[in-house]
Amino acid sequence: MIKLKENDVILFQGDSITDGNRGRHSDPNHIHGHGYQYILASELGANNIEKNIEFINRGNSGDRISDLYGRWKEDCLNLKPTVLSILIGINDMIFNWEHQSGSDADRYEKIYRLLLDEVLSENPDTFIVIMEPFFGDKPEEELDNFFKSGIGAFQEKAKKIAEDYNAVFVPLQDLFDSYRDKTDIYKLLWDGVHPTTAGHQLIARRWKECVKEKLESR
């Protein structure tokens, strides 16, 4: 069980994987969406119910790293998170494939660092979690090769950023790859990108494994 601090504000940020078809209003039945962030909010919330914890989901379907920056003040800085968890990157590859309008790995890194600098300038004690972008398979060979040959650069950038900012890095590619000999990868990532219910559960477990010790030692 992960123990949180009194009045922690835990913010999940990212793209559609984090969005999870979340509600855009105040209805508490829907505001967290479905996915790993809902699993974490429900478990951590129940285990810390006396501590007035707030869980916020601001994942936005289709977002690239540049889109995240465009809404950063409203959807991050103004919310004053004490714990910030980010999963972003796969859409930059998708947009580059379709429209040449995503960031390459170098620009991804520059914007990512800018996002974190702004957060830490307002609250240097913000606990940051950087989740690794990941990919399964695509049936189209050319598209599959494009993703598999390119995503490594984004993953390396995310890991390096986590190291430089003393953030927790949550590796996810190896998690899904470890199931390739056990099951059809599409049972975990139904279209090669978006997790199934089981896939989200695996992400939530990995998040807790990586975060627990450092989060509790704040």
Residue map of PLM features:
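Active-site beta-alpha turn of Rossmann-fold NAD(P)-dependent dehydrogenases/reductases
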Residues: 14, 59, 132
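Short glycine-rich His-centered loop
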Residues: 2-31
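Short catalytic helix/loop segments, enriched in acidic residues and glycine
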Residues: 26-46
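Short helix-loop boundary/capping segments at the starts of domains
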Residues: 19, 46-49, 61
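Short beta->alpha junction loops
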Residues: 56-64
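Alpha-helical cap/lid subdomain in secreted, periplasmic
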Residues: 3-6, 39-54, 67-218
